[in-house]
A protein has these predicted regions:
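Long amphipathic alpha-helical segments
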Residues: 1-80
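Glycine-biased, small-residue-rich flexible motifs in mid-sequence functional cores and linkers
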Residues: 1-28, 84-92, 98-326
């Protein structure tokens, strides 16, 4: 059941139920954050209090310009269209949560703070989001060592009860996710596009219905691929996990490189990098930047992986919890 606060966040900050030819544009993250602080400090105190308010009331209480108040009021007027589209999504197994929900992933609040996505669309078991696990990232094009490593990590997660986090794309993501599910484990895919399309295959649908898989995205469920979205979701993979393993990275370009270097700099979680004789140049450079070498072949049994990662981790930087609910 969508709370009134979440309804307002969806109306103001998503394209759900917004006509393609509409002159209105949803608020961006940078626009929403200062507005959220204004709402909290005002007599409204919560987003839900904006429902049913006039332009003049919004303008006065939040001390906005005429243009800003009209934009908010216009976005808030499509409640019926929002409800209709949410019903359609629910009928195909897609649901939504927002930063106003208490069950929103705490690790995003803790690590990303005001960069936390306002809205998450998901299919499957949302309780998996933020459970102990390993993020596996890398190129779509892998050599044999990379393929073996991705499969090994997926199997290890499945057999040791850890969630396998990935981006749900071809290559590393698919290999590791399939291995985790085949080992009767669980997996989370943070998608950059096409959630509606991703849930259609029967094997994916079965895993979603069993509660072994959750697919989530901060983007519209029917959004097509864009480089910007793919780059933007990389941090969302890392920030749910306890550890990250980079299987293969290009040097100083691409989403894998960007996500790994950002995580190393921010110190969200320990970053391991696959090390082997024919590893790509990007792996070499990530090791120089502070990544921890992950050996191939792994010298221990599958069930030793969690213990090995813990023993070989560099302590991540302490993170202050974001206190705001929305």
């Amino acid at each position: 059941m969508l709370s009134p606060d979440s309804q307002v966040l969806l109306l103001l900050c998503s394209h759900v139920g917004l006509a393609k030819d509409s002159d209105l544009t949803p608020l961006t993250l940078r626009e929403w954050n200062p507005l959220a602080r204004k709402i909290q400090a005002s007599s409204y105190t919560r987003p839900e209090r904006l429902l049913g308010q006039t332009v003049e009331e919004i303008k006065s209480v939040l001390e906005l310009s005429e243009i800003e108040a009209n934009r908010l009021a216009g976005l808030l007027q499509r409640s019926n269209l929002l409800a209709k589209e949410l019903d359609r999504l629910d009928s195909i197994g897609i649901r939504v949560m927002t930063r106003a929900d208490l069950d929103y992933p705490q690790r995003y609040r803790q690590r990303l703070k005001e960069s936390t996505p306002i809205v998450l669309f998901y299919a499957g078991e949302p309780a998996l989001l933020g459970q102990p696990g390993i993020a596996v990232v890398g190129s779509r094009h892998l050599d044999l060592a990379g393929q073996e490593c991705a499969t090994f990590i997926g199997n290890a997660c499945g057999l040791s009860g850890l969630v396998l986090y990935s981006g749900g794309a071809k290559g590393v993501d698919t290999l590791s996710m399939n291995a985790a599910l085949e080992a009767r484990g669980s997996a989370v895919g943070i998608l950059a596009d096409s959630l509606e399309k991703m849930i259609r295959p029967s094997e994916i649908n079965r895993a979603l219905n069993r509660g072994d898989l959750c697919l989530a995205t901060p983007y519209s469920p029917n959004a097509g691929f864009s480089v910007g979205a793919a780059m933007g979701r990389n941090r969302l993979i890392y920030c749910l996990a306890d550890y990250a393993i980079v299987v293969a990275s290009d040097a100083e370009k691409g989403g894998t490189w960007a996500g790994a270097t950002e995580t190393l700099k921010a110190g969200w979680i320990p970053v391991f990098v696959l090390e082997h004789a024919a590893m790509p140049e990007g792996n070499h450079l990530l090791l120089q930047k502070g990544g921890v070498a992950f050996p191939h072949p792994f010298p221990e049994h599958y069930n030793k992986l969690p213990e090995w990662l813990k023993e070989n981790s560099l302590a991540p930087k302490p993170q202050a919890i974001q206190l705001g609910l929305f």
